[in-house]
């Protein structure tokens, strides 16, 4: 995947990051990385998170909602599993065999849908209802992924969680049902194991990028704070 999920480094000191980049074969990349992260050198914990949030705000470019449907064919092209250039949809991808269906054309974007495979659309891993579809969150490529429209509708604005007794299961095994993890007992959506790390990193990014706003968002995944961001049960899940 080409997505730059930068917030992996939240668990690292910038010294560690510098060690990672110092062995890069691309000197231009080393130089630009060092410059980009110069303001957070020596920071850790919530101070690092806040500094990264400020840097992300300064450099963020909102490309608009419509552009996502086009860029997905480059950013999310399947080069890891089927290697066929179709969109790599976490809610329909079958990592161990052929996909039940694929999306390989911009014309397959939703519209309406009645079942899986009808069309693809934009899945907000952090539900847009929590921020009332406001920009730039609604258009933010780093948490808005391509997905089957029908499965996206099933996920709705539910939190991610673990499901032992699903009410509904997608063709690739993603599940909808009552959460069986931790104390929260609402309805949740569980993607397949292959992509749980991708989703966790995207949500880590979101919680950092929008630190200045997220305290006012309302959702079961949140704890109402700007620093920790996510509720205790959800942090353990991630």
Go through the PLM ranges and name each one.
Residues 4-12:
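Sec-dependent N-terminal signal peptides
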Residues 13-17:
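Hydrophobic membrane-targeting alpha-helices
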Residues 18-98:
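N-terminal module-boundary/linker segments of secreted carbohydrate-active enzymes
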Residues 30, 103-104, 126, 181:
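A generic structural signal for ordered alpha-helices
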Residues 67-76, 104, 129-133, 186-190:
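Short alpha-helical segments and helix-capping/turn motifs at coil-helix boundaries
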Residues 87, 94-119:
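Short, His- and charge-rich active-site/binding loops that engage polyanionic ligands
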Residues 109-121, 125-238:
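Domain-level detector of nuclease and nuclease-like folds
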